Amino acid sequence: MTSRGRPSVGGILAKMRRDLHHGPLVGVLATAMLLGACGGADPLSAQSQSQNPAGLLDKDRQPFPTTPAAGTGALAGPVLEALASIAPTLRQQRFPTDAVRAIGQSGDGRLLWYLYDLLRLATRDGVPVVVEAFEDLSGAEFAGEPFTAMGDRILAWDLPAPPNYRQLKRDLFLLIEPRWAPFFDDEDSAIDWRLVGWGGVFIDNRPAATAGEVCPRGCIPALDEPAVTDAAGGSWYPDDALVFGVVVNGEARAYPKNIMEVHEMVNDTLGGRRLAIPYCTLCLSAQAYFTDDVDGFAPLLRTSGLLARSNKFMYDITTFSAVDTFTGEAISGPLLDAGVTLNQTTVVTSPWGAWRAAHQDTTIIAEDGGIGRSYPPDPLRGRDEAGPIFPVGDVDPRLGVHEVVLGVLDADGTPVAFPVGSARLALEAGEAVDLGGVTLQPDSGGLRAFIDSEEIPAHEAFWFAWSQFQPQTRLWER
């Protein structure tokens, strides 16, 4: 929840309409003036001490290098000039080599965040310049692919951002996708911009996604109100292929994993309720949120093309409010003003044959999604077999990063995770699987969670994802 005001839905929409009539967005020149207003003090005059992030391990269970020193004062004049020149130079399709090197020699570790952001816009010749500046500023070299290595380190080091970082990042990221501006322009958002990166695709801002409408620039396209068939009509889908099963008010539906890997977002109606079902393929996390109980307003969710620590960054297309994919909590825009947190229901990950046998009246998304599209059996083709492809920072070493867990919140709101493989084996052996008052029961090859016989929302995810968004999680062990 948020301490910002809580207007009615009418107030939400009125604010949205006012925002749409705002004038041109502040540009790079304004950034330079804002940074200059901070003064030209030497950032090293009040610097945090270097320290070793003791106990923090990367995804290969190796320790991170010593945390670099970070300035606590205003940025120095030469650094301000360098920062102010970078976006305009990139806009001219030139790479600002001298400015990047000046940042690398600044001695202020806070600017490592900016260098990492800049890496996504660097030319082939510019990448080594950014890498060298990052190594100079951090005092630590690295070998191999720089994108995840740099990202993992700055996430683990958890350095503060430099002054006016949101605006600095805005100037870079709007060169990629100008339609992200409303996210950056909400000064009171709950977004930690340090954790936000580009996922390599553009925003899905299509007002309708029911007939295969395309994104001209390329996006991860949501699917609205997909066509469905009965279970017999789902004979096209192999029995051993996975579905994400949802039951609402006694009505069951299966969402084939291969279709969800293409769309990553389905807005649907099931059991008389409106649902949004995001699937973050990077986190292996399919979740189901009710979107019809927001004070009479129904958000329509889309994929932004951004990521937040390797998790999908979704948003409501009507109000352009960002919503935390893992928690359902609005983190920007009018929905944050209204204190909106979407309620969840359980998603069961199950083989289609087992789901169909347990839920004989189930429906399943049509083979063509209702939009005449052909879906390959395995769209990702083993993409994640070698580990996370985006930075995840420090990891909880209790499990491997890609071990699958079922995550829930207990009655006190404490996160609890159950390793799926071990939990299934225990249940098959007739053992009880419970922790913190939460008990698991099998469902068609998947799992459901209960407290005192009352079902609670649950979903599966990779361990790295669940543990980083729920760092205080309790872990069940067999």
Q: For each predicted feature, which ranges?
A:
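Boundary at the C-terminal end of the N-terminal hydrophobic targeting segment
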Residues: 43-48
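Mid-to-C-terminal functional-domain signal that highlights helix-capping/loop sites
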Residues: 53-59, 73, 77-89, 112-478
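HEAT-repeat alpha-solenoid elements in large eukaryotic scaffold proteins
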Residues: 91-94
